[in-house]
A protein has these predicted regions:
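ATP/Mg2+ or Mg2+-diphosphate-binding catalytic cores
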Residues: 86-124
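Conserved lysine of the Walker
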Residues: 128
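Hydrophobic positions on the alpha1 helix immediately C-terminal to the Walker A/P-loop
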Residues: 131
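Conserved substrate/cofactor phosphate-moiety recognition/catalytic segment
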Residues: 136-200
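Conserved phosphate-donor/acceptor-positioning beta-strand/loop module used by diverse small-molecule
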Residues: 224-244
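Small-molecule kinase domains that catalyze NTP-dependent phosphoryl transfer to phosphate-bearing small molecules
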Residues: 246-306
Length: 306
């Protein structure tokens, strides 16, 4: 099997150079893409940026839908860390770089804390996605493998369109009909199940306005043997309306919801029941990001018992 070849390079010096051409070898040219993603993840993790590391993984999953690949993420990242540690000893990185990557390797090989499932609830404009992102980052800072799964992204994936694609008036009824919504929550269940099986906590970013949708996720958590947490987002109606108008103006977000959608949701949503309230966390999102982050940290400490 030829892994290295001598290539003639047409430059003024008329020299030949030896270059690896592994990528042209049929047996070696292909790699599990989660292995490549694990390289970036590992480097962020090794440089003490766990929140950025898991934010990157969530973005990768939003783009690929490869939640099953999470099973290989930590082993692949550990392998990458081992290679970096070896290279550090052989090169100029020295003891400091070796120590960084060796500690990273040890952390990746250690059994992770027990995962959990966090489900967002709230009408459009209440700040669910912002809270979900803050929660994911906070869980990562607490040393927990974690990914966020967004209903807006998974709905568009099922429809075979880009995350930021917008429906025409004729398409809206199909995209947001009862059948498509059921399929979307089924897809969220599948993605969350894959993440939990890989030892990752999951933050499910969805409206969850019907009790059946919330019970679906609670049942999944029970079947997986993990704790279920319901986080309910609130905001003043006028502020929610302003946010949605601004989001529509800026574009680029997977959510299609506008002010009219929010008003309809307020009319038909199924409030949290007395049974659900026992384990639910209520968040007030008044528009102050720092205050919201403080709330998230405080509620997460309650959930984790720290």
């Amino acid at each position: 099997m030829a892994i290295r070849e001598i290539l003639e390079v047409p430059d003024p010096r008329l020299k030949t150079v030896s270059t690896p051409v592994t990528e042209f070898d049929e047996d070696l040219r292909r790699i599990d893409v989660i292995n490549d993603a694990a390289f970036t993840f590992m480097d962020l993790f090794a440089h003490d940026e766990p929140a950025l590391a898991w934010r990157f993984v969530s973005a990768y999953l939003d783009g690929t839908g490869d939640h099953d690949g999470l099973r290989g993420l930590r082993p692949y990242a550990a392998y990458r860390a081992l290679v970096r540690a070896h290279v550090a000893l052989l090169g100029s990185g020295g003891v400091e770089a070796f120590g960084r990557y060796w500690r990273c390797l040890e952390a990746l090989m250690a059994p992770p804390p027990a995962p959990g499932l966090w489900l967002m609830m709230g009408v459009s404009g209440s700040g669910k996605s912002t809270v979900a992102g803050l929660l994911r980052d906070a869980l990562a800072e607490h040393g927990r493998p974690v990914v966020r799964v967004r209903s807006d992204v998974e709905r568009k994936r099922l429809l075979g369109v880009a995350p930021t694609a917008r429906p025409t008036l004729a398409q809206t009824a199909h995209w947001y009909g009862a059948d498509q919504t059921r399929q979307t929550y089924d897809r969220l269940m599948t993605a969350a199940q894959s993440a939990l099986a890989a030892g990752c906590s999951v933050v499910v970013d969805a409206a969850s306005l019907r009790r059946t949708e919330r019970e679906q996720m609670r049942t999944l958590a029970a079947m997986a043997g993990v704790r279920f947490h319901l986080w309910v987002c609130h905001a003043p109606q006028a502020l929610m309306a302003d946010r949605l108008v601004e989001r529509e103006r800026q574009g680029g977000d997977p959510s299609d919801a506008g002010r009219a959608v929010m008003e309809r949701q307020l009319a038909w949503m199924e409030p949290v029941t007395a049974d659900e309230k026992a384990g639910a966390r209520e968040l007030s999102n008044e528009g102050d990001l720092a205050a919201l982050a403080t709330q998230v940290q405080a509620l997460l400490r309650q959930d984790l018992g720290t």
